[in-house]
Amino acid sequence: MFSLDTDDDTTPAATAEPRNSYLEEKAFKSRTLLIFGGITDSVAADVTRRLIALDADSAEKPIDILVSSPGGHLESGDAIHDVVRFISAPVNMIGTGWVGSAATHLFLAAPRERRVCLPNTRFLIHQPSGGAGGQATDIAIQAQEILKARHRIAHEIARETGKPVDVVLADIERDRWLSAQEAVEYGLVSRIIERKTELHR
């Protein structure tokens, strides 16, 4: 996903769209997608559409996804996660900036050997949260769904990192921040890279 600040008065509005289209085209041709900022339904729709298009273009060539996101809507992250696994083309996940919450979940869609990060990336794992309102029965239902999501996320992290589920459940009870090296040790990523040339070794 690309975003240009069109509110900047120093940038003529007429040049914003061509510049955006140029960047979009260059990124697409290089089979590179960006997930930056909050994960929403619109972001999920955009990313999954591009994944399917790139997979149709070539099911053998890898797709690179750079992720720098605080997270967002869990089900939107689920959509990206599942489509990454649904397509045939291999996907490389590249963490940069920070990868947190629902973004960590979609990051884990790639096999461990295809999960890398840049040196200053930080990761955040924690349990899902949500606001509960309405009648008491509705609040109880929402609370139950959050507990289900918590266990689902814990099992996914455990499966993809090799950590015991009970350890992951304890780790996500509160915010758990990890540096790039700590993420490697935890199993979230396979290695830290500094150059693009290191990605496809």
Model segments located where?
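Terminal-region recognition feature
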Residues: 1-201
